[in-house]
Amino acid sequence: MITKASFRILPIFVLVLLTLPSRASAANQAEFDLPRPNGCHPVGTRTIVLRDPRRSRDLLVTMWYPATESASTLAPYMDKKTADALAEEWKLQPNFQRLVLTHARLQAPLAERGPFPVVLLEHGSSVVPAIYTVLAEGLASNGFIVVATNHPPDSLISVFPDGHELKFTPYWPAEADRRTQGVAIGKFADEVLVADVRFVLDQLQEMDSHDRVWHGHLDLSKIGIVGHSMGGTTAALATQKEPRILAGANLDGSTYPGMNADVRPIPVHKPFLFLATEEHASGETRAREYIGSESNTYYVVVSGADHMSFTDAGLVSSRFTRDSKPDNSALERALLTSTLTRSLVEEFFAKYLKAAAAPNLDLIVRVDKK
């Protein structure tokens, strides 16, 4: 681990053969079980709407949490409108979501052995929080309450309970040069995404104090944040700026908003985990990603991964790609990367929010002095 700013991370290439999740169905079966969570808790899930009157902004927030055993309905992977939008974007089979089986129960009672640490989950641009279900269910089964905010207009679509929807809209000037676009993206991250994170944290405090369902279950002295792509940038910014967040993880996002090294890096002075693809790690800005970072920073390069490997995309696409047969080899690769991602993120937050051991994380990450 890094304890002084004079230390630097040595990225290492990781190819780990892990036991495949037991409930991953064979590709020729009709239904497809997402990988089973590996923790001791059953998982529940609820989706709520948080309204910020000051900013005239509504946010859909999905929460996965440790639950008691329940016979309540198994949660759908996503609603039909969201699935239709994703199927169009990713060229998936119509109604694929009906065949994807999750492991969370809708509105299951919360486990009584709380309160539980909180992990905020931040999505990338033009996707939806549901594509991080495997990661979210895994964290929840290991004793974390996961809070995933849908951030319009950065998400692919937000479908609210009353039926109205908001779709992805670019928030950067399309015809501008790369640096100008990067400045616009950084401004959006600061003024919208990090503001959303802070608003959600404020609402969690209210919920823990007064809400009938959540009262006493949220340990808000132990908060982490993990994000992918643009969500990784959000996670880095929020970890830097928000004192309530103790640790963060960035899944192949940039610490340079808009991937522009001349805009500004984001130094992080708290425990932080980077998971990166080989392509990202070999980029010209990679060596400066963590300039100024200190206090237990990890940088892991995942061999063979692509940008979407840190989501459910590889699992879903290998099974439900339109006009092609299921790809068993692609499914196996996706399972390996998904399992590795979940394991390292779970261990990282267990270490820094629960003071637990992190044997796999500490085994594969090494540092040296400059």
Write out the residue ranges for each language-model feature.
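Bacterial N-terminal signal peptides
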Residues: L10-T19
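Short substrate-entry loop that stabilizes the transition state in hydrolases
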Residues: H103-F116, L121-V159, P257, H280-S282
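Alpha/beta-hydrolase active-site loop
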Residues: V159-H217
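The feature captures the conserved acid-bearing segment of alpha/beta-hydrolase catalytic domains
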Residues: L246-M308
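Domain-level recognition of soluble alpha/beta enzyme cores
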Residues: A27-V119, A330-A334, V345, A350
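Active-site machinery of serine-nucleophile hydrolases
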Residues: W64-T68, T82-A85, A130-R178, S303, ...
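Primarily recognizes the serine-hydrolase "nucleophile elbow" in alpha/beta-hydrolase
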Residues: F199-R264
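C-terminal catalytic-base region of ester-bond hydrolases, centering on the histidine
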Residues: E31, I291-K370
